[in-house]
């Protein structure tokens, strides 16, 4: 009997208990006692990740939709109430009585009572997508895997998280197999035309996204996240293809209008030959859908390959 008891104790002690903390943005945070049941997503791509994990029934709000104006007008995004056009005021956020708030960009969390530390002090768990953490690495697909793994554990959806990771890897592998052969197509990414020709340099996610699709970012050699160039610089690079972000504040249609009507930009090869691709803004963020996005880009770029 004594031996049986000792074996039972040894077995219990040898079984690892669920850690009482989780790691995010290089810090340890208190893990919730139970799976979150009132989740708020700040930024559309953060909501997309949660929805992909199957957390929709537990989501009580989403704010800051980037490319879905219809959902904002309807007041619901894939069944989740839209609580603010941009980031919600503190009273609006707290009124949702959230037990988990997930942000897509660092700006999602303020400096006051909506900061991560103040929210934690009020018993609200927070998570910031790893690609938005200060000083993050450039392993964007690794960030997606990490987001899925940690949030999958917090939500009790580990199997779903693993399935999403495997699906992303499969899509990335397939994208590489169908990418155009030969010299990679040069692509200029136009993020916004509001304050100039805003794009991304080598540190932005567009660079590895295009690489996965068999192309190269013409600004990859610039060691910055955000880059604004002038017309003359773009003309000198004369990219094979132009990628246009479609966002509520900067629609792809408006970018096309600029490119086709501007006396300088209209002379670009990609504009003259209509080798321009519209893509929803949120698909240009690192999310579980990034493998599928790279695969679709590879297919489109293959059809635009220069002989």
Report the location of each language-model feature:
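A short, structured surface patch at a secondary-structure boundary
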Residues: 38-96, 100-107, 218
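A ligand-binding cleft/hinge motif common to bilobed small-molecule-binding domains
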Residues: 107-121, 241-260
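Sec/Tat signal peptide C-region and signal peptidase I cleavage site
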Residues: 15-19
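Extracytoplasmic substrate-binding proteins
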Residues: 20, 33, 111, 115-193, ...
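His/Asp/Glu-enriched short active-site or ligand-binding loop at hydrolase and phosphoryl-transfer sites
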Residues: 63, 200-226, 273
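Sec-dependent N-terminal signal peptides
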Residues: 4-13
């Amino acid at each position: 009997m004594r031996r049986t008891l000792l074996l039972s104790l040894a077995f219990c002690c040898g079984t690892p208990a669920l850690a009482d903390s989780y790691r995010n943005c290089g810090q340890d945070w208190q893990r919730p006692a139970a799976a979150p049941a009132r989740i708020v997503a700040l930024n559309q791509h953060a909501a997309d990740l949660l929805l992909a994990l199957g957390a929709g029934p537990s989501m009580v709000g989403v704010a800051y939709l980037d490319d879905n104006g219809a959902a904002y007008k309807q007041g619901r995004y894939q069944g989740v109430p839209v609580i603010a056009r941009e980031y919600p005021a503190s009273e609006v956020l707290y009124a949702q009585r959230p037990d988990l708030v997930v942000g897509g960009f660092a700006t999602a969390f303020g400096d006051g009572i909506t900061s991560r530390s103040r929210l934690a002090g009020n018993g609200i768990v927070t998570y910031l997508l790893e690609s938005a953490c200060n000083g993050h690495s450039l392993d964007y697909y690794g960030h997606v895997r990490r987001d899925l793994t940690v949030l999958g554990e917090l939500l009790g959806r580990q199997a779903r998280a693993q399935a999403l990771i495997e699906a992303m890897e499969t899509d990335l592998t397939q994208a590489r197999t169908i990418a155009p052969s030969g010299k990679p197509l040069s692509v200029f990414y136009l993020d916004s035309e509001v304050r100039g020709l805003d794009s991304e340099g080598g540190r932005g996610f567009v660079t590895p996204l295009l690489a996965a699709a068999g192309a190269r970012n013409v600004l990859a050699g610039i060691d910055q996240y955000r880059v604004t160039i002038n017309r003359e610089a773009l003309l000198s690079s004369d990219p094979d293809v132009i990628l246009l972000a479609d966002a509520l504040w900067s629609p792809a249609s408006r970018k096309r209008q600029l490119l086709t009507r501007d006396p300088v930009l209209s002379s670009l090869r990609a504009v003259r030959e209509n080798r321009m691709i519209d893509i929803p803004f949120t698909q240009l963020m690192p999310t579980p859908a990034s493998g599928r996005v790279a695969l679709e880009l590879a297919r489109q770029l293959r059809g635009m390959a220069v002989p």
